[in-house]
Regions:
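Conserved short acidic donor-positioning loop in nucleotide-sugar-dependent glycosyltransferases
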Residues: 13, 29-30, 57
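Active-site beta-to-alpha loop of glycosyltransferases that engages the nucleotide-sugar donor
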Residues: 1-8, 30
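Short, acidic, metal-binding catalytic loop of nucleotide-sugar glycosyltransferases
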Residues: 11-21
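Short aromatic/hydrophobic "clamp" motif used to bind/position activated sugar donors
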Residues: 79
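Conserved catalytic core of nucleotide-sugar-dependent glycosyltransferases
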Residues: 89-167
Length: 168
């Protein structure tokens, strides 16, 4: 039940994937907001879009559906768990590939409004909460100004989005 976020997130991935061939695999956990219909439409339009659906009536939850996506839908060597309300920044996939090694997980830094407590895996910075309120220019300017401070910085915090090799 996150269709407006899913569309926004999909657009950000396609816009910012760079030269990478990105397969997008979506799990629909018995939604009722049109998400599954949109997924069916996207599978017809985008050959790198795949979706699985839990037919319900009981929801299965993220963990079970993530396992299904990785094992049943994904075909690329690198998998990334990504929530529907996330915006992929330019260069993110290059950074993942730069840091990813066997038996490791790479988590991108999240930049989000101060809705939840701070943590080592995120930066609190408000660029809008809803997709229609999102200020991409503000985010890009912030990243350009602060990129020198974070160059090659790693932390121990882990939360989505995270990437790993499918074989692991």
């Amino acid at each position: 039940n996150n269709l407006k976020y899913l569309k926004w997130s999909y657009d950000s991935i396609r816009k910012n994937q760079g030269n990478h061939e990105v397969e997008i695999c979506v799990a629909d956990d018995f939604s009722n907001d049109g998400t599954w219909d949109w997924c069916l439409e996207m599978m017809n339009k985008d050959p790198l879009f795949k979706a699985i659906r839990n037919e319900g009536p009981t929801r299965l939850g993220h963990t079970i559906l993530y396992d299904r996506l990785v094992n049943e839908a994904a075909t690329n060597d690198i998998c990334m768990i990504y929530h529907a309300d996330m915006y992929l920044m330019p260069g993110s996939i290059d950074e993942i590939e730069k840091h990813l090694t066997d038996k490791t997980i790479v988590s991108l830094t999240r930049i989000e409004p101060p809705l939840h407590p701070d943590g080592p895996e995120k930066i609190l910075f408000d660029c809008g909460i809803e997709p229609e309120e999102f200020h991409e220019e503000t985010l890009m300017s912030y990243l350009q100004m602060s990129s020198k401070d974070r160059s090659n910085k790693t932390t121990e915090g882990i939360f989505a989005p995270w990437a790993f090799y499918k074989k692991d």
